[in-house]
Regions:
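A short beta-strand submotif of the Rossmann-like class I SAM-dependent methyltransferase core
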Residues: 108-114
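A short glycine-rich, Lys/Arg-flanked "PGG" loop and its adjoining helix->strand segment in the class I
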Residues: 125-134
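Residue-level signal for the nucleotide or nucleotide-sugar donor/cofactor binding architecture
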Residues: 116-119, 175
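Conserved class I S-adenosyl-L-methionine
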Residues: 140-161
Length: 214
């Protein structure tokens, strides 16, 4: 996140501890937590772009040692009040590690629906790589944009509404499995595994990518 989009997001006012995007956010969170629970030897987790801390809090309730990082002061304030059993840090996400984390390293980095908002998505991936222990995992979620979904949007006349140019701080990067794979492999991640959520096959709402630092 650089100076162009960090200032917009810092001004975003979180007022509730509820999951972003309502039922969709809750369902996606449940899927993410379920995937993490299937991984062995995961104890410490960092949630990059935690927003109001909803996902961070769900993981903390299940006994994980979780730290949430977000650029929004109001998001961190809501998170600290709602989920006192987790740690929260107010910091911009970029290639430089948050000073508040010191030399801390984690078993897993989680980032849910964040990377599509960033002008420089490689910053998030670099930050995640540096925060992970060797052999640790990065779990990313982002809206899915494959060929057939993009074609369906075009044929149904929904391109303008879907790619909303009037939403300041909205989605500015649109990933397919191929482009996300290229980004992650370029920064040292291997063993990529994709799963999908929402709607029907090839028109999925979100994709979830689990990768490993080698």
């Amino acid at each position: 996140m650089n100076t162009f989009d960090s200032s917009i997001y810092r001004e975003f006012k979180w007022t509730s501890e509820a999951a972003a995007n309502g039922r969709h956010g809750v369902a996606l969170s449940e899927k993410v937590v379920s995937l993490i629970s299937q991984l062995s030897d995961i104890r410490s987790i960092c949630d990059l772009g935690c927003g109001n801390g909803f996902n961070t809090g769900q993981l903390a309730k299940r006994g994980y040692e979780v730290t949430g990082v977000d650029a929004s002061p109001s998001g961190i304030t809501v998170a600290q009040s709602a989920y006192p059993n987790a740690r929260f840090v107010n910091s911009i996400i970029n290639a430089q590690l948050p000073e508040q984390l010191g030399l801390t390293s984690f078993d897993l980095i989680l980032s849910c629906d964040v990377i599509e908002h960033l002008y420089c998505p490689s910053d998030l991936v670099e930050c995640a790589f540096e925060l992970l222990k060797p052999g640790g995992h990065l779990l990313l979620t982002t809206p899915f944009h494959g060929y057939w979904k993009n074609l369906a949007l075009a044929l149904t006349g929904r391109m303008d509404s879907h790619f909303d140019v009037f939403h300041d701080g909205g989605h500015i990067k649109f990933f397919s499995t191929r482009t996300l794979s290229i980004l992650l492999k370029r920064h040292g991640f291997t063993d990529l595994h994709f799963s999908f959520y929402g709607r029907s096959p090839l028109l999925w709402m979100n994709m979830i990518c689990l990768s490993t630092k080698r």
